[in-house]
Amino acid sequence: MAHEGPRQVRDRGMTRSKAEKVRPPTVPVPQVDIVPGRLTEAEWIAFTALEEGEDVVGDILADLVARVIDSAFKVYLTQQCIPFTISQAREAMLQITEWRFLARDEGESAVAEDPTWGEDEEPLACTTDAWAQGSVPVLHARASMGLEETFQGEDQDSVDQIPLGGSWKDSGSQEPMESWELTVTPDSPPTPELLQETGPRSPLEKLGDQSRSDQTDLFAVGSSNSSSQLSMEMVPAGSTHASLELSLVASPQASVERAQPISSQFSLEDLYNCTPQPHAAGDRLELREEKVPLIPSRVLVSDPSAGGPTTLNPSAGFQPQPPWLAEERPSALHSRIGRMGTTARLDPARLPRPDMARSPSPKLWPGAKWPSGWEGEAELLGELWAGRTRVPPQGLDLGDRESQDPHQYRHPVPQVLEATSQVTWKPVLLPGALKLAPGVSMWNPSTQVLLSSSEPQRNDREGSASPPIHTGAPKPQVTVAQLMNSALKMWSLPSKRLPNSKP
């Protein structure tokens, strides 16, 4: 037994050493730093557990304090219930008693010293909105309609006028003109090529057909009869000064009054030019007018002196053509008019007529009626406002108009503006002419100066402080007893006659 004891101890030691040799080495757990070098993960977990413990303790303490305060408040309400009820009943009884009696309102004390009580400043004048409806009159341009033009509303009692205002002689030749005869004779009715029409007719054309039967004195001077032939004959009697100008001038101004006779469309200058002058006594002009249903815008006329046909153009005078174009011209004319007839029907209301801008001044036609004075100016302004006429250019004499190039009238006339409102705007009173009342000021936008009355205000003398508000009623200067006892007195004021009034 003694020998076994030390042997077992020796075996156990050997077994333990073998077991230690076989056990693998322990790997150290890596530490994660929350704050590098200062706070590790283990320390962070310890702090979190400690904080959670403190939160739990804080919640428990808050619950205990809330219970204690709630119990104390209930005890306070129980003690104050009776005194509060008594005070509320007393105030209610006093209010009911005041309702029984009318108490005098003494108002607020020290109103003048109170800065919140003061006069309001003068409100600024409202500015006019330029975009408001009716503030600014808007002008719209009327669209042009080819050769159509506004009828010039002249007096029906005036002398018949002739739509002739161009030159009958060649502008390039300097030698005197030979005697020749011009005759336009539409004996037969218009051919279908001239009156060819496709599609429905417009209301303006129907109105022109209705007014065609009433049109008289188209190319007549001092006569009103009608026949079926139109002939113009001019025989110069050797006078080198005879120069009659014919021109059919048209402008693209839109036609407004369709039923007006054509005899009132032409200006006084054309009639003055076509009337025989004293220095050209040998010249005579015979114009006989008969019923002409339609007149084309271009007419071919035989001219024996020029050796070829002559073209009547609405915007130019007589232009002699060479003989080699005499045969080609009629076919080209008919084909052109045929193409034009397919789109629009010829109408007397659309015939070219002189422009209002070529009307002469009163000194060129002393026998005609011309507006003069304030009434004439008012009538002219009324026509201009209605948009029916245009202002004639000033400073153009008859010689200046004759020297102008006739081809310039081919250019379109500037469009006429029509006003959308008939409201007349009066000019604003000048700030310098106004007499302001004491205490009233006005801002002058042109000079950027605040205008005020010449009389100084009393408030400025006393100071910038606002005047005190009277709390009591003002004392009357006259009592009712004085009014009842005093006799009635009347004073007659001298009558002042107005400077413009008649006696």
UniProtKB/Swiss-Prot annotation:
UniProt keyword DNA damage present: no
Keywords: Phosphoprotein
Record-given protein name: Uncharacterized protein C2orf81 homolog
Compositional bias per record (Basic and acidic residues), positions renumbered to this chain: 1-23, 203-215, 347-356
UniProt region (Disordered), positions on chain: 1-29, 149-227, 346-370, 450-475
Modified residues (Phosphoserine): S239, S243
TM ranges: none
InterPro entries with a match to the protein in the record: DUF4639
Highest taxon, organism lineage: Eukaryota
